[in-house]
Amino acid sequence: MKKIAVVTGARSEYGLLRWVIDEIHHATELQLQLIVTGGHLSPEQGLTYRCIEEDGYDIDAKVDMLLSSDCASGIAKSMGMCSIGMSDAFLHLQPDMIVVLGDRYELLPIVGTALVMRIPI
């Protein structure tokens, strides 16, 4: 059985990924691994990881990456936190591949970590 880790960091892209998540979840030859990060874990953004749980999905890993600062240095530090957390999550979950969606800087540490760990994206 192939383990597919879907990484979601915001409600906006979760809405688009939900159909992919649902197909993976129901496929008998695939095992869904759900990793949430970014805005999903932010009280200021409504702790939207709860919406994912309300949709009936188990969250396999929560990777905190947000600092209160949105200056360049704060963003760089957040990206570093994300790399560390993703490394731990990938090491624990051992996914066969990851699925991401987006075009923002938050994806850089996710895909960078997967690349270094030789996990197909």
Residues of each region from the PLM?
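Active-site and donor-binding regions of nucleotide-sugar-utilizing enzymes
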Residues: 5-8, 14-25, 65-121
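Nucleotide donor/acceptor-binding cores
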Residues: 2
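Short N-terminal binding/cap micro-motifs at the start of the first secondary-structure element
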Residues: 13-16, 42-44
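Conserved nucleotide-sugar phosphate-binding/catalytic loop shared by glycosyltransferases and other
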Residues: 32-75, 85
